[in-house]
Structures are given as structure tokens and as C-alpha cells.
């Protein structure tokens, strides 16, 4: 026995694996002796106290066969095991890896039920012949009595169905859908998908059948989409019922710091000079040509002269009322007194222009 264990270790070394150490070989010998001692006691007990016909030198398979026979199972010489009286046919014998080709009559295996959705066809051009694929137009009328069991009658009735759909004799035939089957690419739907195929709309140009949003008067539809250039839509008065639009400047700290009243000279500028200041974005002033209508689009002057710069004037220190006055932060080379700057944070009121 010692030589056999040593030979096994030597064979493992010849196979290219690591040669076990002396302590590992000793542990393997001790473990094998313990296993064989336990097996010998089991065999002795079965022979003494049980009705088991075990050979003198038997292995574990013999013990398993004996236990199966006592429990009412039958073990054939090739290892096929089954309950007594429920011998499976030859075609249903399990394969070498243990899988059964079909469930045995006495097994608890139940085949899974059929899926709730219709199987997809092999081709994306025609509906499956195994499902109900008749064409229904309008209600429950069947064109030509076409069923899904045959493909040739379905192909023959294609011109008939197209003529029915395009004919004016049937004004009420609006809905064209397929019950079951699929005419799209074969896609496996999820388990939670509905079993009914959605309808195909064919009444897009019919004036009598309109979507529900076409006839209703929704105020959010014209306001949420930009109007066309030739058609202007006034906003709904209901949208502006709770708003108060103030003509005063916004309550922004930057806006209040630009000028005490940047547009207070608007009326005087119209009468005195050709340049006026029009409110633009962020409270800035833009030079425009005089004589333009008040609500017309602002046209910028291409070549603005140098005397229009912030705080500059052609008359020296005498600033004309129509020019833009720069705020104190933009005067880089000048010193501004602290008392000339008034902070009006959080207030929408503008103070009068100091003269």
C-alpha cells in the first residue's frame, strides 16, 4: 500500500506537475487509510444487519445499487435508475451527461406553458402560417375568407384587399390591422408585452377622421410652437391675466449701477438729436437712426463716430443729452467719489437723473 501511494506520487511528478513533499504524501496515505476503514465498517454493517448481497471486494457503486433496490428503485447494469413499474422507453433514456430527452411518466417535471405572445415569422415579408393572420378591415369582416393556414390564398387576395381599402364604396372602413402574426422583422417581445398587434393607420388624409387634438381648442398648442412668418398668433389673454408688466427697469444690481436713469432722456433725445437710446438686452443702450418707429426692429449704425464713446463728447466736457454716459466703474483714468455711487440692491425703483 505504501508503494502504491509512492508510485502515484511519482507518476504525478512525471506528468509535469509539482512533486509532493514527504509530509504531503504522508497525509494522503493517512487520509486514504481512514476512508477505507470507514467504508469497510459500512460494508460490514450492511452485510450483518441488512438484506444486501454485497461482494467481498465491493466499491461504492455496489452499495448504491443495494440501497436503491431496498428503497424500491431499479438499477440496471448500465446505470439506468428508475422507480419500479415506471421504466422509461428506450428513446427517453437519459444521455451520457445526465439530461433526459423527454420527461418520464413518473417524474415531477412539467413542460413550460406556451408563451402569451405569437411567435415571430421566419421571414419579415409574410405573416406566420402557424398563427391567425387574416386581414380585418373595419369591424369583423373577413376579406375573401383568408386564413393563416395557407399562404397562397393570402397572396391571391392581396389585390382584392387593396382594392377594398382604396375604394370609395366603403367610407367607414378605416382601420386596417392584422390579428396575430407579424409583418415586421422577427423580434422577440418581452414577457410583459401585449398579445395584440397595434393597428395600422390608413386614414391620414380623411377629413372626417381627425385626431382628438385637431378639433379641440387648446391654448397651449399655438403658444408652445413658434408661429410661421406669415401667420401671427396673439397670446391667449388667460395666460396674461395674473401678470403685471412694469415699465420700470429690472431689479438688478448691475442695471442700477449702469446709470441712475439711462432711458430718462429718451424723449428729449428724439426732439434734440438724431441719435436715440433704445432699450436693448441687459439694460444697455444702442445708437439708432432718428425717425424710426418706436416698435420697429433696431438698426445699428454701421460707422459710429468716435464722439459716441462712453463719456466722450465733441464739445469737451459738455456732454450732449443724447450720448451714453458711462458708469463710474468704466472710467479707468478718473477717480470717482464714493458719495456719487448709490447702491440700490434689491430695489426696482430708479432714482432721478442728477442734473
Curated annotation (Swiss-Prot):
Keywords: Brassinosteroid signaling pathway, DNA-binding, Growth regulation, Transcription, Transcription regulation. Residues 100-131 have a biased composition (Low complexity). Residues 1-34, 78-131 are annotated as: Disordered. Residues 1-16 have a biased composition (Gly residues). The keyword Transcription regulation applies. One of its GO terms (molecular function) is DNA binding. InterPro entries: BES1_N, BZR. The keyword Transcription regulation applies. GO terms for biological process: brassinosteroid mediated signaling pathway; DNA-templated transcription. Residues 18-102 are annotated as: Required for DNA-binding. It comes from the Eukaryota. May function in brassinosteroid signaling. Interacts with PUB24. Belongs to the BZR/LAT61 family. This is Protein BZR1 homolog 3. It comes from Oryza sativa subsp. japonica. The lineage of its organism: Eukaryota, Viridiplantae, Streptophyta, Embryophyta, Tracheophyta. The gene is BZR3.
Amino acid at each position: 500500500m505504501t508503494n502504491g501511494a509512492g508510485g502515484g506520487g511519482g507518476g504525478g511528478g512525471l506528468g509535469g506537475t509539482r512533486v509532493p513533499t514527504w509530509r504531503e504524501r504522508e497525509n494522503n496515505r493517512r487520509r486514504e487509510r481512514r476512508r477505507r476503514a470507514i467504508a469497510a465498517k459500512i460494508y460490514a454493517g450492511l452485510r450483518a444487519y441488512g438484506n444486501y448481497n454485497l461482494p467481498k471486494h465491493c466499491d461504492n457503486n455496489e452499495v448504491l445499487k443495494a440501497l436503491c433496490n431496498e428503497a424500491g428503485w431499479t438499477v440496471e447494469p448500465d446505470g439506468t435508475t428508475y422507480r419500479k413499474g415506471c421504466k422509461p422507453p428506450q428513446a427517453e433514456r437519459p444521455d451520457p451527461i445526465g439530461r433526459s430527452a423527454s420527461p418520464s411518466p413518473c417524474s415531477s417535471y412539467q413542460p413550460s406553458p406556451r408563451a402569451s405572445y405569437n411567435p415571430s415569422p421566419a421571414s419579415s415579408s409574410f405573416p406566420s402560417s402557424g398563427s391567425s393572420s387574416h386581414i380585418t378591415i373595419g369591424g369583423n369582416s373577413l376579406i375573401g375568407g383568408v386564413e393563416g393556414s395557407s399562404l397562397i390564398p393570402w397572396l391571391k387576395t392581396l389585390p382584392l384587399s387593396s382594392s377594398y381599402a382604396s375604394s370609395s364604396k366603403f367610407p367607414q372602413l378605416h382601420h386596417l390591422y392584422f390579428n396575430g402574426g407579424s409583418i415586421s422583422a422577427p423580434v422577440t417581445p418581452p414577457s410583459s408585452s401585449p398579445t395584440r398587434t397595434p393597428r395600422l393607420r390608413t386614414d391620414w388624409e380623411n377629413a372626417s377622421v381627425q385626431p382628438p387634438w385637431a378639433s379641440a381648442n387648446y391654448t397651449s398648442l399655438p403658444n408652445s410652437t413658434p408661429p410661421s412668418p406669415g401667420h401671427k398668433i396673439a397670446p391667449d389673454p388667460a395666460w396674461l391675466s395674473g401678470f403685471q408688466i412694469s415699465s420700470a427697469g429690472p431689479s438688478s444690481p448691475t442695471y442700477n449701477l449702469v446709470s441712475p436713469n439711462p432711458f430718462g432722456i429718451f424723449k428729449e433725445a428724439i426732439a434734440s438729436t438724431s441719435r436715440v437710446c433704445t432699450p436693448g438686452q441687459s439694460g444697455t443702450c444702442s445708437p439708432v437712426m432718428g425717425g424710426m418707429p418706436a416698435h420697429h426692429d433696431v438698426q445699428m449704425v454701421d460707422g459710429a463716430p468716435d464722439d459716441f464713446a462712453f463719456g466722450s463728447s465733441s464739445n469737451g466736457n459738455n456732454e450732449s443729452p443724447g450720448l451714453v454716459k458711462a458708469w463710474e466703474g468704466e472710467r479707468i483714468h478718473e477717480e470717482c467719489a464714493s458719495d456719487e455711487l448709490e447702491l440700490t440692491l434689491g430695489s426696482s425703483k430708479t432714482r432721478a437723473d442728477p442734473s
